[in-house]
């Protein structure tokens, strides 16, 4: 069994110090992989949108977030669990002048310093085109994963890969990414020569590979599709979970929603945990797993 407790850290500014508020949401079971107990801490973010500094007064979650506070929280968590993994589900770019002037260099440098393990790509990562994105990601010290963007023949080839396997002690954690359909979100010239692939088929192929052939104890999808099913037939994490197997956790993004421990049954009737932490870096998600 994979036992998961999920929390949110809401990063708030007080007069004298930053206070980290953890909200316990619930405790449930996901997956069905028998093994002796191991513990894993997963910290995750999404849709930071270049919010390097705390949010301004007058905005929702004013004075929350900011890279310095995030870095402090991550360091605090690493003292509790040095083996934690740190993930991002995309759209770390666009939204403040930091991105307008530096095109993502500030964000990637900060994520290197924070020790991210893997990220996937959001639509705003392409706002200055594939070549600019590739130049920025050349300096990344973390894996960039996306299983449904074919990057063959582009400057992202060799930088973006379908999945990665993170090792922590005896644990093997498979992490793969899914990008949103760029149509209507990304200018064609900024996405070319990449090809968008169907997310469900791509996800199932990679999940089967990770679980069955690569013998991963846990399979995590970093998805930039949006969490909830919708009447427009647009791909979502909820639909993905229902239509696949061998995925244990989907960490979502794109729709800027607070998704608090949503469990969806997959094709085999096993529970898949869906999470998303809103936007602008006001919160960090924390998942504690026993396998």
Annotate each language-model stretch with its function:
Residues 1-11:
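N-terminal amphipathic/basic-hydrophobic helices that include classical n-h-c signal peptides
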Residues 5, 20, 24-25:
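Leucine-biased recognition of intrinsically disordered, low-complexity hydrophobic segments
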Residues 9-21:
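Bacterial N-terminal signal peptides that target proteins for export
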Residues 24-33:
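Hydrophobic h-region of N-terminal signal peptides that target proteins for export
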Residues 32-291:
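Acidic, metal/ion-coordinating pockets
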């Amino acid at each position: 069994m994979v036992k998961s407790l999920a929390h949110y850290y809401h990063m708030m500014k007080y007069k004298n110090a930053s206070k980290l508020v953890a909200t316990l949401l619930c405790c449930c079971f996901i997956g069905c992989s028998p093994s002796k107990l191991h513990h894993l801490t997963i910290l995750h973010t999404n849709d930071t949108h270049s919010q390097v500094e705390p949010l301004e007064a007058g905005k929702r979650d004013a004075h929350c977030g900011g890279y310095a506070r995030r870095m402090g929280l991550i360091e605090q968590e690493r003292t509790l669990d040095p083996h934690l993994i740190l993930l991002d589900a995309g759209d770390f770019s666009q939204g403040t002048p930091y991105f307008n002037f530096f095109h993502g260099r500030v964000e990637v440098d900060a994520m290197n310093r924070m020790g991210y393990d893997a990220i996937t790509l959001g639509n705003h990562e392409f706002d200055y085109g594939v070549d600019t994105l590739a130049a920025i990601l050349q300096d990344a010290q973390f894996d960039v994963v996306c299983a449904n963007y074919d990057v063959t023949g582009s400057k992202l080839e060799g930088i973006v890969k379908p999945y990665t396997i993170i090792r922590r002690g005896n644990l093997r954690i498979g992490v793969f990414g899914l990008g949103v359909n760029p149509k209507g979100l990304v200018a064609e010239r900024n996405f070319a020569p990449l090809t968008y692939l169907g997310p469900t088929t791509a996800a199932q192929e990679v999940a089967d590979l990770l679980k069955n052939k690569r013998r991963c104890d846990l399979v995590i999808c970093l998805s930039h599709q949006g969490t909830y099913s919708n009447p427009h037939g647009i791909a979502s994490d909820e639909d993905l979970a229902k239509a696949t197997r061998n995925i244990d956790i989907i960490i979502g993004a794109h729709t800027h929603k607070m998704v608090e421990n949503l469990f969806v049954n997959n094709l085999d009737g096993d529970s898949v945990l869906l999470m998303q932490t809103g936007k602008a870096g006001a919160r960090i998600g924390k998942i504690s797993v026993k396998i």
